[in-house]
Amino acid sequence: MFQRLSSLFFSTPSPPEDPDCPRAFVSEEDEVDGWLIIDLPDSYAAPPSPGAAPAPAGRPPPAPSLMDESWFVTPPACFTAEGPGLGPARLQSSPLEDLLIEHPSMSVYVTGSTIVLEPGSPSPLPDAALPDGDLSEGELTPARREPRAARHAAPLPARAALLEKAGQVRRLQRARQRAERHALSAKAVQRQNRARESRPRRSKNQSSFIYQPCQRQFNY
């Protein structure tokens, strides 16, 4: 830019162009509010990449591809500033984020009924018990499913006891509800009211007063 101004004022001849030096393809530069805007001419073609393979002889040479984007935008200083309070806030990972990954015992996929083998106990499937011949996958499948069946067969008695207790509680609740409905029925209430209103009958033997006839007076 300063060379252009100096050439306009002092009329200094421009330096000779070197054929080996690439041409400048920028025709106009402008800086507005920290954004550098560069305009490229329409006739600019992208230089061929050095690693590109040469085109075969049977194909025509490809047409020069013009650059689709003629504007290059650089971010303003507020995005590239460094220091406290100048740049964007950087999020730091918390050490508690990988808690479940670092501690598999807290995973929700761990089942409670796991089989723990004692250090002195023999393995459930020793190598000596296996035959020397090759076995197919169908013959090995039952042997692999035996530990799983034993694992699920252990809590069956406890589950049966819980179901029996739940059945007893349900029967007691039904009997209690039936008694309450019977006590609150209309006929039962009517019988209770009639029993309260009715007076007990007195027997003749209980009366101690004896009625005697009075003396009659005849007027002749």
From Swiss-Prot:
GO terms for cellular component: autophagosome; cytoplasmic vesicle; cytosol; nucleus; PML body. Pfam families: DOR (PF14839). Residues 47-64 have a biased composition (Pro residues). It comes from the Eukaryota. It is found in: Cytoplasm, Cytosol; Nucleus; Nucleus, PML body; Cytoplasmic vesicle, Autophagosome. Disulfide bonds: none annotated. Residues 205-220 have a biased composition (Polar residues). The modification Phosphoserine is found at residues 14, 136. GO terms for molecular function: ubiquitin binding. One of its GO terms (biological process) is osteoblast differentiation. The LC3 interacting region (LIR) motif mediates interaction with GABARAP, GABARAPL1, GABARAPL2, MAP1LC3A, MAP1LC3B and MAP1LC3C. Interacts with VMP1, GABARAP, GABARAPL1, GABARAPL2, MAP1LC3A, MAP1LC3B, MAP1LC3C and THRA. This is Tumor protein p53-inducible nuclear protein 2. It comes from Homo sapiens (Human). The lineage of its organism: Eukaryota, Metazoa, Chordata, Craniata, Vertebrata.
